[in-house]
Amino acid sequence: VSTSAPNDRAFFGHPAGLGWLAFCELWERFSYYGMQALLVLYLTNYLFLPQNIGHVAGIDAVRGAIEGVTGPRSPQQLASVVFGLYAGFVYLTPLFGGLLADRVLGRTKTVVTGAVLMATGHFLMAFEASFFFALLCLLIGVGCFKGNIAAQVGDLYAPGDKRRASAFQIFMLAVQVAVILAPIVCGTLGEKVAWHWGFGAAGVGMVIGLFVYLKGRRHLPPEPRRDRAAEKAAAVPRTPMTGTEKGRLVLLVALIPVLMMTVVGNQQYNNAFPLWSQKYMDLVLFGWQVPVTWLQAIDAAASTAAMVGSIAFWRWWATRRREPDEITKMALGSLIAAAAPALLVIASGIVDHSSEKVGFGWAIGYAVLNDIGFANVMPVGLALYSRTSPHKLEGLMMGTYYLHLFLANTFVGWLAGFLETMPGQQFWGLHAVLVGGAGVVLLAVKLVFGKLLAPTAVDNGQAAAPGSGDAVPAH
């Protein structure tokens, strides 16, 4: 419960703490997305090349473990698997960070610990030998930081304070600014100057974020002490789940592999797509070679526009026709997203027949189609799981929902290995089939289980709002 005064409106009508938290999050996300934009390119084009890979401490053990599952990997294939594992575990570690904050350290100490670990990890990326230790620091740091700083935003507001929703919109706007700027700044330094300059810029961003957080701590509400005896005495006896709740629970868990497939094209944007673009796309603009990492800035801008446009579209639609339910929106989103890799099937055909690189517009087309689809899958799915999960398991089920991103990233890391051995038309065609097939499965789920998922009076909150949901960065 917040201890902030209701009349605290120092930051655009919100508590001053929101400004500090949003600015801190901007720099943390700048460091994260700046490093992510460079990672697969750095591994493929430099660190995992035969003349350099021997410098990496622990590479024999890591490579042996990966190749024990996948078979021998080329530098690009190994880079894609490592990137996929890193990007996947980013969605698991916040579960443990939340437990650490709730039961041991408290949110503030956990956030500071996470920021220090991430800054350390970014600077360790400057040394080839410490690469895997750097990734470990980053993963643990993200786990400590990510969920807990968002929880502190909620702590600024008393229950029922109507400013809470717009507070998270402001918070997410800071994230979107970082997602756009990070690939431009860190990517340009990494590709045009030296890889370590890009990683160093990400580290500087994290240090700034830590300084901002420490400076703004006095504006955050104090954390209440937990009275375990009182909590135990006040505990309400658990009631058994109803048949509807059990059915929904089974269905929501069973949907995770389907949701994994819906975002395969989206998650590939940071893995195989920059590698494909580097080889087959003409990135010269007005005589200047545009860094490949800038494609991610284009995608971030398209993602922001798609999220806002989707919300506006469904609000407009609801004034004229009956609005579709969440599953239908997600199915439509998947089918739209499938058009993005399908577009690259055409581009790959042009490359194969003309032996010339394709233009910049194909990257923009991929980003726009993918992000329109993603805007109707990811946040809408979040709303579906929030509404239909059994109330006493809502927190667990929200964590379970993010499991599909862990699975998608690890799967995409393996799938990206086929980029070297499979013709481009087949490679991107496979992605289009996987994403489109998931959309068809979601339509089937709607037909068979529509009544089970339909809104009821006992749902958690209301049915999904138009275009629902929180702004979620595309990658």
Q: Which residue stretches match the model-derived regions?
A:
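Intracellular loop-helix junctions on the cytosolic face of multi-pass helical membrane proteins
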Residues: V1-G17, P159-G160, C186-G287, G309-S310, ...
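Hydrophobic core of transmembrane alpha-helices in multi-pass small-molecule transporters
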Residues: L26, G121, S130-F145, S354-N376
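Central cavity-lining transmembrane alpha-helices of secondary-active solute carriers
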Residues: S80-L99, A297-S310
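Glycine-rich segments within core transmembrane alpha-helices of 12-TM secondary carriers
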Residues: V90, R163-E191, G198-G209, D299-S303, ...
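Conserved MFS/SLC helix-loop-helix module at the cytosolic interface between two early adjacent transmembrane helices
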Residues: T93-F123
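C-terminal ends and interior cores of transmembrane alpha-helices
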Residues: V116-F133, S334-S355
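Intracellular juxtamembrane helix-capping segments at the cytosolic ends
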Residues: C144-A158, N376-S389
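Transmembrane alpha-helices of Major Facilitator/SLC transporters
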Residues: W288-T319, L332-P341
